[in-house]
């Protein structure tokens, strides 16, 4: 049986969490808050004051996101086998007497691979941002892993062939699981010539939502690059609702659950009572901390909920600040280009984050900018953030 690094990390933390009596319920009864929930307060109301506290709080947030919207992570597979052939990595996964195989095409840099392998960015379907020539690209067909045709495709795809169509894992959880299995295969397949310690993940639009979820759920992802993910991605549910109330036609939680199966079926019961959620997507992004994260937003498309993305990532940035690594989290928001079309003016921040987190270079990644074009809706930090940012040592 292959024990993945992720499972080892979870098991190691479980011992620490148990010693600290870290309570991680899937839901919290009686919660009500119209503002963005405090990252630095435990479920029981006590404060998060140390970096060790944050590890427990992070586990709480992870449990809540799985309990309310993404669905539970499945049991670990019994085996994961990778086979490298030419420009392809085949991944075979077995569990409960069943097996699935999925193939991933790879574009390699020219020349001889470093001893540790090439850094690699896993792109959902295909990359819509420019990946440097010294970084490999692995194209992951996430829609085959968990179909996203409509709500009627719930429970369909390779993931559900293995774990059953009744699994409450959302399509995005299935995709994140697929990313984890790719990393397992990279770790165990030296012939793939990819560095498992230098893995990024990216996607745009609906796949951008998935890329952020993968970065949050899989701790071996060194750099997360969601692009124009909007509501359900780097935008917060509460803030998107507010934008709609102010007259903007944006994607909201109530709309999104009727559009597709990106979230678990259980999320439906909360979308008309968002104040009952003891988290929002600033806390989803906070799960990535202290690893590298930069998200890209496009204000030309009101549907993407621009104020919500900016405000949500502003709130998430507080966690990076508390951990002493604000430069590890970036945000860039511009207009003047089509949806999922990359504007060259963003090359600087993208290359900086790739150079730092995948190539190990000592470069500045101090990028957090917006054009503040929010269709007439104003972001007011004091309206949404009513908590202080501590220093977590």
UniProtKB/Swiss-Prot annotation:
Pfam families for the chain: GCE_fung (PF22244)
Record: glycosylation sites: 103, 168
Keyword hit for Nucleotidyltransferase: no
N-terminal signal peptide: 1-19
Intracellular or extracellular location(s): Secreted
Enzyme class of the recorded protein, top EC level: hydrolase
Gene3D superfamilies hit by this protein: alpha/beta hydrolase
Motif (GXSYXG catalytic site motif): 203-208
Cellular component, GO annotation: extracellular region
Modified sites of kind Pyrrolidone carboxylic acid: 20
Thermal activity characteristics from the UniProt entry: Optimum temperature is 50 degrees Celsius.
Documented EC number(s): 3.1.1.117
List of catalytic residues: 205 (nucleophile), 339 (proton donor/acceptor)
UniProt catalytic activity: a 4-O-methyl-alpha-D-glucuronosyl ester derivative + H2O = 4-O-methyl-alpha-D-glucuronate derivative + an alcohol + H(+)
Coarse class of the protein's main subcellular location: secreted
Any one GO MF annotation of this record: carboxylic ester hydrolase activity
InterPro entries documented for this protein: AB_hydrolase_fold (IPR029058), GCE-like_dom (IPR054579)
Keywords from the UniProt entry: Disulfide bond, Glycoprotein, Hydrolase, Lignin degradation, Pyrrolidone carboxylic acid, Secreted, Serine esterase, Signal
Family the entry assigns: Belongs to the carbohydrate esterase 15 (CE15) family.
Function of the molecule: Glucuronoyl esterase which may play a significant role in biomass degradation, as it is considered to disconnect hemicellulose from lignin through the hydrolysis of the ester bond between 4-O-methyl-D-glucuronic acid residues of glucuronoxylans and aromatic alcohols of lignin.
Protein name as annotated: 4-O-methyl-glucuronoyl methylesterase
Species of the source: Schizophyllum commune (strain H4-8 / FGSC 9210)
Lineage of the species this protein comes from: Eukaryota, Fungi, Dikarya, Basidiomycota, Agaricomycotina
